[in-house]
Amino acid sequence: MFKKFQIHLLDNFPHLKNQKILLALSGGLDSCVLLSLCLKQGLNISIAHCNFQLRGKDSEDDALWIKKLADKNKLECKLKRFNTEVYAKNKKISIQMAARKLRYDWFDELSVKHNYEAILVGHH
């Protein structure tokens, strides 16, 4: 899998090798595999994790696990807690749309503030 990723990366995104990258890490399989591949490739990444507070203690546990994973790999880790349900209600949008808006607005904010040149998200 790594060899295919490496070839795809070099063929389609050669500029990423020298860029400061923000990697969105949900804790799910897709984003964790992406993190592993990026670490193996030696990319300059920082982690961003959104806690949408939709799953109670499980949401908090995910954030703690991601912080430990970042520390273990000596990666900068940005964590943010959102009041997603209130935001969705106030904007009269679905929880999914609210989470998407909150997530990508925050990623844009981080990119400007910390000069990230690319944002990677793991979705199948």
Predicted regions and their residues:
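Core alpha/beta nucleotide-donor-binding catalytic domains of modification enzymes
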Residues: 1-124
